[in-house]
């Protein structure tokens, strides 16, 4: 259904619905984008939760709680967009949600933030529970693969444990930022002045992290499952540990490439954002892509629908990642910002 909403938007842009109000496009855009990201995240979390049962014991009760909370959040999101024409886009940049200008009613904005609050609470609890389950068997240093970095023998840590731990630690930081954003929106509704640039920075910090860790959790599943089809192990080693250790740091700063148009930002932040975006592509993407190619090369690969989709997913990640690195260049972004290049670079994911 969400994919069909994307098709509807392309038809609308082509002039297929000349009599339709423009507000419908933006309401559908909001539902499509948030719905897609949410679906990917929930799917990735459910997938790693299942695979982690081989090594740990995440709580089934927490998973059921998240199932119910996610459904409630989705219902509210559908109501405020298709029912209330709430149309700020997935980024809901301050102060747009507070000024419907007659396009959407206050109840739609309220429902939107209630939906975000419910989803944020549920997903944070889910994230913390998985980290708890990992911590019951692995110490933090072991789960992050630090023993591989120093050459110290220890408990063998599967890549799915390492990547999930890195992703969810960063995810907690993103959810904290989301809580702050929602709280500041509430404060502004009560008349308290807030800094627009701070609001935008927190919003993109949260959004960029959520989208990235969603992909990383998918990659973690590929690390775990693709070897079953290749007949070869894919173990954690020093290179893998170094790569994902770098991700833990760099991902916190790569979101700056969303803020290049904000001339009020200090120049050093813009430069640091470009450098971080470049460097992030190496550990997360290059190591995993070359690892996939090395695993498949000269192996007795069983090419089924599942293994083919795993492989194509990694290739699509690489294609979209190259386009993302190009767009994270300040001079290029100056021309490509707010063009079709932006959605084109992340749809291959």
Short names for language-model regions:
Residues 1-16, 22-95, 105-137, 156-190, ...:
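Hydrophobic cores of alpha-helical transmembrane segments in multi-pass integral membrane proteins
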Residues 266-277, 337-343:
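Non-cytosolic membrane-interface motifs at loop->transmembrane helix junctions
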Residues 297-303:
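Histidine/acidic residue-rich metal-binding segments in metalloenzymes
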Residues 139-155:
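Membrane-interfacial, low-structure loops and terminal tails that flank and connect transmembrane helices
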Residues 98-101, 335-337:
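Short, membrane-exposed interhelical loops at transmembrane-helix boundaries
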């Amino acid at each position: 259904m969400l994919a069909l909403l994307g098709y509807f938007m392309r038809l609308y842009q082509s002039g297929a619905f000349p009599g339709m109000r423009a507000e419908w496009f933006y309401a559908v855009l909001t539902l499509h984008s948030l719905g897609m990201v949410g679906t990917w995240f929930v799917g990735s979390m459910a997938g790693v939760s299942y695979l982690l049962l081989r090594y740990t014991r995440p709580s089934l009760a927490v998973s059921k709680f998240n199932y119910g909370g996610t459904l409630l959040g989705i219902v509210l999101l559908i109501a405020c967009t298709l029912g209330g024409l709430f149309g700020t886009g997935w980024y809901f940049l301050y102060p747009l949600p507070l000024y419907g200008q007659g396009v959407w009613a206050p109840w739609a904005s309220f429902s939107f933030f209630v939906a975000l609050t419910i989803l944020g609470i549920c997903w944070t609890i889910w994230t913390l529970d998985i980290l708890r389950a990992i911590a019951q068997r692995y110490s933090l240093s072991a789960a992050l693969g630090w023993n591989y970095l120093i050459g110290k023998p220890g408990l063998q840590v599967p890549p799915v444990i390492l990547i999930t731990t890195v992703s969810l630690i960063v995810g907690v930081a993103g959810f904290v930022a989301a809580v702050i954003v929602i709280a500041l929106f509430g404060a502004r509704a009560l008349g308290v002045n807030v800094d627009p640039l701070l609001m935008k920075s927190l919003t993109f910090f949260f959004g960029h992290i959520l989208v990235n860790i969603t992909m990383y959790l998918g990659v973690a599943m590929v690390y775990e499952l693709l070897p079953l089809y290749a007949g070869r192990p894919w173990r954690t080693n020093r290179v893998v540990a170094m790569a994902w250790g770098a991700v833990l740091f760099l991902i916190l700063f790569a979101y700056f490439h969303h803020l290049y148009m904000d001339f009020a930002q200090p120049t050093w932040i813009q430069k640091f954002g470009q450098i971080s975006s470049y460097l992030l592509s190496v550990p997360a993407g290059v190591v995993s892509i070359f690892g996939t190619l090395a695993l498949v090369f000269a192996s007795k690969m069983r090419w089924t629908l599942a293994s083919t989709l795993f492989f194509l997913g990694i290739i699509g990640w690489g294609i979209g990642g190259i386009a993302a690195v190009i767009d994270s260049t300040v001079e290029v972004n100056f021309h490509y910002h707010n063009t079709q290049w932006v959605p084109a670079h992340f749809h291959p994911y």
